[in-house]
Amino acid sequence: MNSKIFAVLLLLAFLSCVLSDQYCPKSSITACKKMNIRNDCCKDDDCTGGSWCCATPCGNFCKYPTDRPGGKRAAGGKSCKTGYVYY
């Protein structure tokens, strides 16, 4: 009986890890000079290895998702270009 309870608890723990929400990590940078703004990506498809395209004050960068909210996904769109962005 105890092994069945343990198996159920183990399964629930596994499912809670798999089904947890994922977010872009919060950027530690609060501001960036316009000449330093660069986009490494515009959408998630531009990233590899399960990383996401996340927006920061210095541009869009591929980051691995985290379970802590606070970051922002890159909006992408037709106007998004990779490389240095001069406004």
Swiss-Prot record:
Tell me one GO biological process term.
Answer: defense response to bacterium
Q: Which UniProt keywords apply?
A: Antibiotic, Antimicrobial, Disulfide bond, Secreted, Signal, Toxin
Its localization reads: Secreted
Where do the WAP domain residues begin and end? 21-66
This protein's GO cellular component annotations are: extracellular region
| Keyword 4Fe-4S in record | no
Query: Which N-terminal residues, if any, form the signal peptide?
Result: 1-20
Matches recorded under InterPro entries: Elafin-like_sf
Q: Which domain of life is it from?
A: Eukaryota
Q: Does the keyword Mitochondrion apply?
A: no
Tissue-level expression reads:
Expressed by the venom gland.
* Cystine bridges: 24-54, 32-58, 41-53, 42-80, 47-62
Q: Name one GO molecular function term.
A: toxin activity
Kindly provide the PTM information from the record: Contains 5 disulfide bonds.
**Summary of the function given for this chain in its UniProt record:** Has antibacterial activity.
Q: Which family does it belong to?
A: Belongs to the venom protein 11 family. 01 (wap-1) subfamily.
Q: What is this protein called?
A: U15-lycotoxin-Ls1f
